[in-house]
Amino acid sequence: MTRKTLLGGVSAAVFVVAAAGVGLADIRTGDSLVINGEIPIVTETEPPAHLDGALSTLYSGWVFRTDETRAMQADDFDNPGMLYVEQGISAFNTAMGTEGNSCASCHENPESLANVRPSYPQWDEAHGEVQTVEMQVIECQTERMGMEEPYGYDSQQMRNMVALIASVARGQTVDVAIDGPASEAWELGREIYYTQYGQMELSCAQCHEQNYGNLIRADHLSQGQVNGFPTYRLKNANIVSVHNRFRGCIRDTRGEPYAIGSPEFVALELYVASRGNGLTVEGPAVRN
């Protein structure tokens, strides 16, 4: 993998991109997102202390979208991501594996999982590692349901299930723990976030910390918050996972990405999720 550690400032690569037509766009602040007229979503708030002033305000990706895209997310009837949530509900109630259990056998209903998405990724003491929601689903399927072939990490079935888990947590505050045994993975994620990748020598920070609100290829750069994932991307006509988006970003730098579900991407997700502590869960969000 081609990478270069960011030592400070905006790199020559960013200057080249800027010279190619990136223009500063006004951030539309102050607008409110209330899903279905009853679930208020925090779209801007003060950053967590552990960012040490890297951002003055946290902004949901919703802030950077057009009126049309915003409206789609505000109503479940118009949100295409909810079609995948419905598929997740069907899977939730379907028995799988040799044990003959469904998710509902243990959890009764999806709403009982409302506290999951706001706190993940999180340290799993039994397995001695930081786990994402996807890893937890795989653990349940293999260890409790007897599935020899659990959902693939980025499979459609997995994305449907994680979209369901996110949907029941909408409006709950993101509160990802980064202390204790999770701190080592968090530090790795932070290192990856500030590392330049690919031929363009770009880091996550150079786009999403130093240039959010600017236009690149006719689209607004956001802060790269992950509180809306899995996200329905209009360009993909499907819901997209956090790691799939990480992979796409690194590919955009003309670099070779880590594997989906790899320890590196798990660490990066932990770090990026913690940057959004104080926002609220809004997945499945709608983005370009």
Give each language-model segment a name.
Residues 1-4:
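N-terminal secretory signal peptides that target proteins for export/translocation
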Residues 167-219:
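Extended amphipathic alpha-helical interaction segments
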Residues 99-110, 161, 189, 199-211, ...:
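The canonical Cys-X-X-Cys-His
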Residues 98-104, 217-220, 286-287:
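Extended intrinsically disordered, low-complexity coil regions enriched in Ser, Thr, Gly, Ala
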Residues 191, 198, 206-212, 224, ...:
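C-terminal cap of thioredoxin/glutaredoxin-like
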Residues 6-84, 121-187, 235-257, 265, ...:
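Post-cleavage N-terminal segment of exported redox proteins
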Residues 114-121, 216-222:
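Short cysteine/histidine-rich zinc-coordinating motifs and their immediately flanking basic loops
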